[in-house]
Each structure stands twice: as structure tokens, then as C-alpha cells.
């Protein structure tokens, strides 16, 4: 392993700093945080590694305990104590608060990420974040909708909040194919107010798997093939209760075709009569929303990371070994120093 380099030495060797930023994301209880805890402070090449942890302190102790309240709300809706309208309003408000820390940090970070230098660069800094804003604005809301805890109208309000993505985003979706192991990991966390909801777990796993295909689709079709997307949309079936059940419960396989079809993306969930004309075409506003979602996803470099059967140590080794294959972006050295200060402040106030 190379000796860790000091910031002053590195700054004197380069005219600008180069950043690799990676978001670790995936279903709850899958082992992301354990991985992040074990990732070293320097890479094998001696590059400093900064880690941004889950804002659990903000979620649990700033005002409302979001984790306990969202689970309690969904339980009460399923017991008939809340209507769908009532639970949707509460869940959406809570989900917005889950998203707030991610969105605030993302805004600060985005202003510092400039043009892409490609891959296999010589980074000055590696930044690894526990979840992307897409988790709280898209993935969890869709899963809550599929489980019947959030209405379609409230879901649309949430996905609009996904921010624009600056160049150089690397999104790693952690996947655990062994459901029994996944349930065991989630149960063993024993967090106050957290429950092992198998339906929600399956819905989340399905959504995250589909997210990868959605980003691949966006990378292919945006921004020049809007007509092709609209044509594919008309061929989609109406997304009804039976399709929702199939989406959640049937095992998904990684799409291996030459190009992902719209049918394999999260957008297929929005083929609803409430959003469309009689011929199936989207209303103008909803077409803007969904096309806008694709445009926001198209700058993301996405990869699946199957951790089935791997120890946490092996997961970390595999994750770090492929770091050179990820996108690198330019930034000023002042920006790099500011990122370090921001990470320290954020973790101190937000993380447990």
C-alpha cells in the first residue's frame, strides 16, 4: 500500500483536484452502513477517503422520530385507523423530512463538481456517501406506494423533488439475493421503532433493481430520443393491482438485452388512467414530470453490487478494488478543502 499523501503535498503536485464520488445505496438493512464503517481512510494508492454517514440523528432526534412515526402510520393504515388519504399525507410529509439532509448536502456538493475527466484518473479525493437523494425522493416513496401506504398523487409530488445531478455521479446499488439473510440482518439491527416488514422489503428490493434498468434506459434515450420514448409509452400495459403484485413478488433478473426497454423501468408504474388520456398518452404535465425524471437520471453512472455470500471485509475489498473504473470530476483545491469541512460538520450533527 502506498503511503497516505498529505493534502499540502497533493495540492502542490496538481493544478486542480480530482474527485471520485460514490453513493452506496440499496434496500434497508442490507449492510451498506457496515461496509462504510469498514472502508479505510485511505485507498491502496494512498488517496484520502471521506465518508458521509446516514443522517440517523436528524431522523430520530430533530423534532419528530421519523423512523418510528412512518412505521406506526403504515401499521395504522393497514389496521384501518387511517384512510389512504390520511396515511398518504403523513407518509409524504415524513418522507420529505427523510430527504431534507440528503438534499441540503447534495446542493452544497453539486456546486463543487465540474467537468468529468473520465475514468481511470488519478483522484485527489474519494468521497463515499451512504445513500443518494434518489433513495428518499424516488425509491422509498415508490415502495410505499406499491405497499398501499402512499397515493399516486403524493408519489408524483415526491419524485419531482429529485435534484439535478452534476457530472461524475457513481451510484452503486447493493443487492442481496438471499431474502432469509436479508431479513436476518434487518431484524438483528434491533432499532427502536423499526419493524421487519417483509412486503416493504420486497417492494424496496424490486424498486432498486428496477432503478438500475431505469438509469440505463435514461442513459441511452436522453436527451435525443423523446419521440421514441413516447412511442414506447403507448405500448405499455395499464399498471394495475395484479402488475403491482407481480412487480413486488416475482424475482427480477438483470436485464441483458442490447437496450433496456421502457417496460423494464420504474416509469411503467406510472401508466395509470388518472395520468393519461383515453388513448394512453400522458397528460402534458405528467409527461414533463416523467421525462424530467429521465433527464435527471441520465448523468448517473450506475452499477449493481451483489454481496450475496460475501463478508463485510470482502465487500469492502471488492468495492475499493474497482474504484479506478469510476467517473472522476475536476474541482478546485479550495472546493476539495470545503468538502472535507462540510463532511466533518455534517457527520457531527447528523450521524449517530
From Swiss-Prot:
InterPro entries, per database record: Herpes_TK, P-loop_NTPase
Binding of ATP, residues: 26-33, 185
The positions annotated for binding substrate are 95, 191
Residue numbers annotated as active site:
54
Reaction(s) catalysed (UniProt annotation): thymidine + ATP = dTMP + ADP + H(+)
Molecular function via GO: ATP binding; thymidine kinase activity
GO biological process, alphabetically ordered: DNA biosynthetic process; TMP biosynthetic process
EC annotation? 2.7.1.21
Q: Name one Pfam family in it.
A: Herpes_TK
From which domain of life does this come? Viruses
Which UniProt keywords are listed? ATP-binding, DNA synthesis, Early protein, Kinase, Nucleotide-binding, Transferase
Q: How does it assemble?
A: Homodimer.
**Hey, which family's this protein in?**
Belongs to the herpesviridae thymidine kinase family.
What function does the entry list? Answer: Catalyzes the transfer of the gamma-phospho group of ATP to thymidine to generate dTMP in the salvage pathway of pyrimidine synthesis. The dTMP serves as a substrate for DNA polymerase during viral DNA replication. Allows the virus to be reactivated and to grow in non-proliferative cells lacking a high concentration of phosphorylated nucleic acid precursors.
Report what the protein is called. Thymidine kinase
Q: Which organism is it from?
A: Gallid herpesvirus 2 (strain Chicken/Md5/ATCC VR-987)
